[in-house]
Amino acid sequence: MTKLRLCYQTVEFGKTDIHLCTLRDKQEFDDPQGAAEKLGISSASWPLFGVVWPSSMVLAHYISDYNTGTKRILEIGCGMALSSLLLNKKLANITATDHHPEAGLFLQRNAQLNEGLPINYAQVGWADAHDDLGLFDLIIGSDLLYEEQHVALLANFIEAHSNPACEVILVDPGRGRKNKLSERMIEFGFNSLH
């Protein structure tokens, strides 16, 4: 991470501050060992995980007032994991996931910045058949549907990790694929309220 230009920022949720170390901008790139390339992450898409997107802010603001109780929560495609960091402040049972090889390092760094407990993290792709994440009561994510093939992959991943009464909260900026995802989830027995 030392070759990257970084940015530090604080996001406020009422009386709760979340401190973030992010990439300075969407032009950063550092993959000297080719780890991202081996996962199919191009240099153009490499920095997308490392900035806070508007959809992430919307999800975090929504989840800040959400009563998580004792629910086991999974954030998929966490990127900078703003919602996971906020839920961690609330002492929620959160696991964050992302496909990007650097996301876990930034999550660890940001959890320390916020003086919180370590956050469970798994580097996993939606097509990965062998993960041991288990089942969750609440699955959250934002701005996930970049490409057409993501619809089926995401739907199958959510179905594979959902308890029978699982709630799914996804924020989409209008990339044109949310209706297809909703249709797939309805086929799995979910209800859609979008």
Spans of features found by a protein language model:
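S-adenosylmethionine-dependent methyltransferases
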Residues: 1-194
